[in-house]
Swiss-Prot record:
Membrane-topology descriptor: Single-pass type I membrane protein
Subunit annotation: Interacts with gelatin and type 1 collagen. Interacts with the actin cytoskeleton.
Modification after translation: Glycosylated. Phosphorylated upon PLAU binding.
The protein's name in its UniProt record: Anthrax toxin receptor 1
GO molecular function: actin filament binding; collagen binding; metal ion binding; transmembrane signaling receptor activity
InterPro entries assigned: Anthrax_toxin_rcpt_C (IPR008399), Anthrax_toxin_rcpt_extracel (IPR008400), VWF_A (IPR002035), vWFA_dom_sf (IPR036465)
Region Disordered: start-end pairs: 400-442, 490-562
Polar residues composition-biased segments: 490-500
Intrachain disulfide bonds: C37-C218
Keywords for this protein: Cell membrane, Cell projection, Disulfide bond, Glycoprotein, Membrane, Metal-binding, Phosphoprotein, Receptor, Signal, Transmembrane, Transmembrane helix
GO biological process per UniProt: actin cytoskeleton organization; blood vessel development; negative regulation of extracellular matrix assembly; substrate adhesion-dependent cell spreading
Signal peptide (UniProt feature, chain positions): 1-30
Annotated positions binding a divalent metal cation: S50, S52, T116
C-alpha cells in the first residue's frame, strides 16, 4: 500500500487515538482491559524455530499472538520471520489486519527443526527495512528476536553484524532469551542490556513478559498541545506520548512536522522525557495549513508516524474585544446619565409626608416576650380618698411614667402593684384546625440567606432613595444655566489719595445742590434739620434728582420765589 493510503488509514484512526488522552502508563487499554500500544511503526518478529523448541512451539505462538494483538494502531505494520538453518519470511510487512490474522495461522502451522542461525532472520528483516526506506517512507522499525539457546562463536559474530546493519537502517532491536540463553550475547545483539527480556522459568513464562515488552517497545504519539495555532505566529508544541527515552541516545531524538503531505521540517526538542517532548514548531503562514506530527529516535533516519494533526486558524489581535468593551462601557454610562440627569435638571417640591403612626405595643407580632410594668392605683391621686375619683390604672414605663401618669402627681399613699412575671410570653397561634403552627427548623443555609437578605435590603434602600428623588410624570423643572451678563458701563475703581508734589492737588469733586424753594417758616415746635457736613475727599455717591413729593391736599403747592 502506498504512503497516501497509509495516511488515509491513519486519519480513520484519529478518533481511536483521541481516546488515549485519558489513559496512563504505556499508552492505553484495549476493550478487554489489557494494555495496548497506539504507535505507528514497523514491527518485525524474528522467531527461533530450531529443533530445541520443537515441543514448545505452541507457547511461542501464543506469545506472539497475544503481543501482536496489543499493537492496535492503524498505522502499524507487522512482519513474521522464522529462522533455523535458514531464514524465512512467513508474512511480509503489512498493516492489513486480515493479512495479519492469516499470517498468525501460518505461524501456528510451523514445524520446528534445524540449527540456530539467528543472523538469517536479521537478514530477512534488514532486506525489508532497506526496501521500505528506498521507497521514501523511512518508517521507524522495531525488531523483537526470540531464541532459547547459546550461539556458537561464529554464529554470534554474524548475528551481531546483521543486528548492527538493521540498526544502521533505523531499527530498534529487542531480544527475548528463554531458559538456556547467554545474556551477554543477547545484550550485544540488542541495543543495550535494558533491551533484553530474560525468561528463566521456561517457555510457560512467556505470557508474563508481554506487559514489559509492550511497555518498553511501544513508542507512540498520543496528542499535541496546542492542536490549533495562529497563522503566521511562532509557537512551541508539547508532544504527549510514551517511549521517547527508549532511544539509544536521547540526543538524537527529533520532532518532525510534515506540512500538507509535502514538506518535512525537523526540529530538535528543548526537553525529552519518557511521556512528552517540548519542541519548537515551524511558522505556518496561511490559514488552513496542516502539519502531521512525527518523531524520530535516530536523528531523522526513520520516523514514528501518528494521527496527530496541527492546524492553523485566523487569530484576531484583540481589537474587537476592546471595541466591544468600549461600547459596553458607553452604554453603561448612558444608562447612568439617563437615570441621574433628571435629578440634576428638575426641581421638585413635595409635601412633607405625615409622621408615621407608632404601632401599639400590643400589636407587636415579632414573637418576642412583652415586658410587664408596675401598675399604680390612681384613685389616690388628688381624690382625697377612695371615692374621690374614678379608679384608673396607669402603667409605668422603663423611662419614667407613661403619658397618663405624667399628668398626675404621685401621692404618698399611692399603691404600686408589681407584676408577678417580668415578661409576658405570647400565646402560640393556632391554625384553622386548632393545631399549633410548628416552628420552622433552622436550615444550613439560614446564615447565608440572612446575609443575602440584609444585602438586598441595603441595595433596595439605596435604589428607593434615588427612585424617590426622580421626577414623576407631570413634574416640571428646568436645568440650571450659568451665563455671563455683559455690563454696558464698566465699573471705575476709586482714585487713591496719593500726593504728587509736581502737580497741583485736584479740586474736590463737588456739585452744589440746586437752590431750595421758598417755603414758609416752620412752626416753632418743629425741630431744625441738621446742617449737612462738608464733603470729604472721597467722591460723593452719584447724584440723583430728589423725589417729587405730593403736597398735602389741604393747601396748594408753593410757588418759587422771584
Amino acid at each position: 500500500m502506498d504512503r497516501a493510503g497509509r495516511l488515509g488509514a491513519g486519519l480513520r484512526g484519529l478518533c481511536v487515538a483521541a481516546l488515549v488522552l485519558v489513559c496512563a502508563g504505556h499508552g492505553g487499554r484495549r476493550e478487554d482491559g489489557g494494555p495496548a500500544c497506539y504507535g505507528g511503526f514497523d514491527l518485525y518478529f524474528i522467531l527461533d524455530k530450531s529443533g530445541s523448541v520443537l515441543h514448545h512451539w505452541n507457547e511461542i505462538y501464543y506469545f506472539v499472538e497475544q503481543l501482536a494483538h496489543r499493537f492496535i494502531s492503524p498505522q502499524l505494520r507487522m512482519s513474521f520471520i522464522v529462522f533455523s538453518t535458514r531464514g524465512t519470511t512467513l508474512m511480509k510487512l503489512t498493516e492489513d489486519r486480515e493479512q495479519i490474522r492469516q499470517g498468525l495461522e501460518e505461524l501456528q502451522k510451523v514445524l520446528p527443526g534445524g540449527d540456530t542461525y539467528m543472523h538469517e532472520g536479521f537478514e530477512r528483516a534488514s532486506e525489508q527495512i532497506y526496501y521500505e526506506n528506498s521507497q521514501g517512507y523511512r518508517t521507524a522499525s522495531v525488531i523483537i528476536a526470540l531464541t532459547d539457546g547459546e550461539l556458537h562463536e561464529d554464529l554470534f559474530f554474524y548475528s551481531e553484524r546483521e543486528a548492527n546493519r538493521s540498526r544502521d537502517l533505523g531499527a530498534i532491536v529487542y531480544c527475548v532469551g528463554v531458559k538456556d540463553f547467554n545474556e551477554t550475547q543477547l545484550a550485544r545483539i540488542a541495543d543495550s542490556k535494558d533491551h533484553v527480556f530474560p525468561v528463566n522459568d521456561g517457555f510457560q513464562a512467556l505470557q508474563g513478559i508481554i506487559h514489559s515488552i509492550l511497555k518498553k517497545s511501544c513508542i507512540e504519539i498520543l496528542a499535541a498541545e496546542p492542536s490549533t495555532i495562529c497563522a503566521g505566529e511562532s509557537f512551541q508544541v508539547v508532544v504527549r506520548g510514551n517511549g521517547f527515552r527508549h532511544a539509544r541516545n536521547v540526543d538524537r531524538v527529533l520532532c518532525s512536522f510534515k506540512i500538507n503531505d509535502s514538506v518535512t521540517l525537523n526540529e530538535k526538542p528543548f526537553a525529552v522525557e519518557d511521556t512528552y517532548l517540548l519542541c519548537p514548531a515551524p511558522i505556518l503562514k496561511e490559514v488552513g495549513m496542516k502539519a502531521a506530527l512525527q518523531v524520530s529516535m535516530n536523528d531523522g533516519l526513520s520516523f514514528i508516524s501518528s494521527s496527530v494533526i496541527i492546524t492553523t486558524t485566523h487569530c484576531s489581535d484583540g481589537s474587537i474585544l476592546a471595541i466591544a468593551l468600549l461600547v459596553l462601557f458607553l452604554l453603561l454610562a448612558l444608562a447612568l446619565l439617563w437615570w441621574f440627569w433628571p435629578l440634576c435638571c428638575t426641581v421638585i417640591i413635595k409635601e412633607v409626608p405625615p409622621p408615621p403612626v407608632e404601632e401599639s405595643e400590643e400589636e407587636d407580632d415579632d414573637g418576642l416576650p412583652k415586658k410587664k410594668w408596675p401598675t399604680v392605683d390612681a384613685s389616690y391621686y388628688g381624690g382625697r380618698g377612695v371615692g374621690g375619683i374614678k379608679r384608673m390604672e396607669v402603667r409605668w414605663g422603663e423611662k419614667g411614667s407613661t403619658e397618663e401618669g405624667a399628668k398626675l402627681e404621685k401621692a404618698k399613699n399611692a399603691r404600686v402593684k408589681m407584676p408577678e412575671q417580668e415578661y409576658e410570653f405570647p400565646e402560640p397561634r393556632n391554625l384553622n384546625n386548632n393545631m399549633r403552627r410548628p416552628s420552622s427548623p433552622r436550615k444550613w443555609y439560614s446564615p447565608i440567606k440572612g446575609k443575602l437578605d440584609a444585602l438586598w435590603v441595603l441595595l433596595r434602600k439605596g435604589y428607593d432613595r434615588v427612585s424617590v428623588m426622580r421626577p414623576q410624570p407631570g413634574d416640571t423643572g428646568r436645568c440650571i444655566n450659568f451665563t455671563r451678563v455683559k455690563n454696558s458701563q464698566p465699573a471705575k475703581y476709586p482714585l487713591n489719595n496719593t500726593y504728587h508734589p509736581s502737580s497741583p492737588p485736584p479740586a474736590p469733586i463737588y456739585t452744589p445742590p440746586p437752590p431750595a424753594p421758598h417755603c414758609p417758616p416752620p412752626a416753632p415746635s418743629a425741630p431744625t434739620p441738621p446742617i449737612p457736613s462738608p464733603p470729604s475727599t472721597l467722591p460723593p455717591p452719584p447724584q440723583a434728582p430728589p423725589p417729587n413729593r405730593a403736597p398735602p391736599p389741604s393747601r396748594p403747592p408753593p410757588r418759587p420765589s422771584v
